[in-house]
Amino acid sequence: MASFKKLTATGSVFSGRCRFHGFVLGTDSTNDPTITIEDRAGAGGQNAGEIIPTCTYDATALGLNGATGLPPEGVLCDNGIYVTISVAGGGAVEVTIFYS
């Protein structure tokens, strides 16, 4: 069963071997967030690469943005899951990561 963690700023979701199952994000409807999700234990941890490449999401899009096309079993992360978040104009964003 997958767990989840909600972030509103850059940070670690989980440290250690795990599976990434996807994410959703909600915005303030004005300021576009830029998100990168990596196989990394923390800010100074070993980086095994991007799980979700850096992408800017349209804050004016209706509904939630998120990851599609992931394998049903998730993506294996050896080091953990780390999310880098920035928001144009200093707006607000919530990113919920699903993992096991």
Go through each PLM region and give its residues:
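Surface-exposed, low-hydrophobicity beta-strand/loop segments enriched in small/polar/acidic residues
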Residues: 1-100
